[in-house]
Amino acid sequence: MGSLNSIAVLGGGAWGTALAQTAARAGRKVTLWEHDAGNAEHLIAARESRFLPGVRLEPSIQVTRDLAEAARADALLLVVPAQVLRQVVTSLQPLIAPRTPLVACAKGIEHGTHRFMTEIIAEAAPAAIPAILSGPSFAADVARGLPTAVTIAATDAACAQALAQAMNSGSFRPYHSTDVRGVELGGATKNVLAIAAGIVEGRQLGASALAAMTTRGFVELVRFGKAYGARIETMHGLSGLGDLTMCCSTPQSRNFSFGMALGRGEGIESAAHGKLAEGYYTAPVLLEMAQAKGIDMPISTAVAAVLGGKLSVDAAIEGLLTRPLKAEE
């Protein structure tokens, strides 16, 4: 695959804007597509995202609401929620050239189908090259140009390398991989585990409990990954352990802050602050997939039970602490 000189970013929220900034700093021609008219007009007029106040758009970024214009780019970053990805890719399918890389930048699993993000892309746009970008990265850090490392994966090794090269800048370092499943799985699983860590923090159970929750959560991530074909080095890398460690330690993570609010006793609607964390949607799907393969995931099961109204936070914590003793894996 040749060089990718133009990048379109679909989604003008905080993460989409941050990735557009990164691509522009890497010297790419960047188009930022925003569906919402009000947000698009604000981006054009103010050259600043409502979600990243104080961060000025790079001069080379062109903002548009025309999907066909965005679809002409050499590669497209799809920065839309996991549950609407299929709808967006279906709209893109007739507009893109064959073998255009479509890079999912959401971390989740589709409801009903249990499809990972690249599987959705492959089904909705068979002529495209599916890819995934994931890793420990907050939009505010990336937008400000703070040092960040992520993983970009595609089964097409040349495509993964070309995407990493296209997004590489002085502060944003992408590693490339062909373990698409491992990269996707790490991002989706950590969403649920970060809610658990947030509950521990919100309940003020202490640093020891938070460390235990994060570590045992990683054990669950590895179990799930092995069962679904992920490579062990991927789970120990940026998109697995790296992302989990970050999102289980700071309220900058929406899943962690959502869990903190639940731990303080807030209801789900109040804890969501107007937008539910992706882990809320992923938890029941993750549980179904774990049960289908007989994978023991007690922390994820407890989170799903709390979110489904089947257990109180205190009952979930008690259940985890009173499990039979066992050898450490």
Swiss-Prot record:
Q: Name one Pfam family in it.
A: NAD_Gly3P_dh_C
Please list the residues that bind NADPH.
Answer: 15, 35, 107, 139, 254, 276, 278
> EC number(s)?
1.1.1.94
* Top-level taxonomic group: Bacteria
Where does the record say this protein resides? Cytoplasm
User: What's an example GO cellular component term for this entry?
Assistant: cytosol
Q: Is Nucleotide-binding there in the keyword field?
A: yes
Name its pathway.
Answer: Membrane lipid metabolism; glycerophospholipid metabolism
Catalysed reactions listed for this entry: sn-glycerol 3-phosphate + NAD(+) = dihydroxyacetone phosphate + NADH + H(+); sn-glycerol 3-phosphate + NADP(+) = dihydroxyacetone phosphate + NADPH + H(+)
- Write out the GO MF terms: glycerol-3-phosphate dehydrogenase [NAD(P)+] activity; NAD binding
Q: Does the keyword Cytoplasm apply?
A: yes
Among PANTHER family, the record links this protein to:
GLYCEROL-3-PHOSPHATE DEHYDROGENASE, GLYCEROL-3-PHOSPHATE DEHYDROGENASE [NAD(+)] 2, CHLOROPLASTIC
According to its UniProt entry, what is the function of this protein?
Catalyzes the reduction of the glycolytic intermediate dihydroxyacetone phosphate (DHAP) to sn-glycerol 3-phosphate (G3P), the key precursor for phospholipid synthesis.
NCBIfam families according to UniProt: PRK00094.1-2, PRK00094.1-4
Q: Return the protein name.
A: Glycerol-3-phosphate dehydrogenase [NAD(P)+]
Species of provenance: Rhodopseudomonas palustris (strain TIE-1)
Gene encoding it?
Answer: gpsA
